[in-house]
Design a protein with these regions (language model features):
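Bacterial N-terminal signal peptides
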Residues: 2-14
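N-terminal low-complexity, acidic/polar interaction/targeting segments
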Residues: 21-225
């Protein structure tokens, strides 16, 4: 099974064409996750802290969500839809309780009303409630901190080295591994986001209670390939 170590979304259009707008760096930094954020539930796409991902927004309710977010703090939450979501997709289908908040770094509003956005992961969150005052979903959330103690950073660095070696062993010919200059945190999350696996397995990685636990799970997964 091939590894997806570069983001490849069928809906992606590069945000380098005329009309793309960047969000100023000062606005793109969130010192704390808001108590309430809009949710963007998706069937086959996850986001991890420190990673970037492009999206095309075409449903009217989510166009409104992006327009509102751009007027506010630029933050939305990516959550994975649970199996069976098709029965109530137009309403409020079942979702997982842990997601990742992201800030809109770049966006482009197309003539037909669609948005192209580049989203940068900020932090994982836990949903503690929902509000139904908007056409899109709003959730009350709590941030799930991924802070590391000094001794845990040593462990994470060792696990990152294991992951790098295992990736080199299974990468298809011509594929590029992640940038070796990345911080350990970012490296682990980029591999977790882009390694080819079922989305339910990726959700399991997202829900790990620490970066060390996530890295250990990645090592175990790569060793089974």
């Amino acid at each position: 099974m091939p590894l997806l170590l570069a983001i490849a979304l069928a809906v992606f259009v590069p945000l380098s064409q005329p009309g793309a707008q960047g969000v100023p760096a000062a606005e793109a930094k969130a010192s704390a996750l808001p108590a309430e954020i809009p949710l963007f539930p998706l069937p086959e796409t996850s986001l991890f802290p420190g990673t970037s991902r492009p999206f095309q927004i075409y449903e009217p309710r989510y166009r409104e969500m992006i327009a509102d977010a751009l007027k506010d703090n630029k933050i939305i939450g990516i959550v994975l839809l649970r199996p069976g979501f098709e029965k109530d997709y137009e309403g409020r289908p079942p979702i997982y309780g842990i997601g990742c908040a992201g800030v809109i770094e770049k966006y482009q509003l197309l003539p037909d009303g669609r948005y192209l956005i580049l989203l940068r992961g900020l932090t994982t969150f836990r949903i503690v409630g929902e509000d139904q005052r908007k056409p899109y979903r709003l959730a009350r959330v709590e941030a799930v901190a991924e802070l590391l103690k000094d001794e845990e950073r040593v462990t994470l660095s060792a696990l990152r080295n294991q992951i790098e070696k295992l990736l080199y062993a299974v990468l298809p010919f011509g594929a590029d591994p992640p940038d070796p200059s990345l911080d350990d945190d970012e490296f682990v999350n980029i591999v977790a986001q882009n390694l080819d696996m079922a989305e339910s397995d990726r959700q399991d990685l997202l829900e790990r209670n620490s970066l060390v636990a996530r890295a250990r799970a990645l090592v175990e997964r790569l060793e089974r390939r």
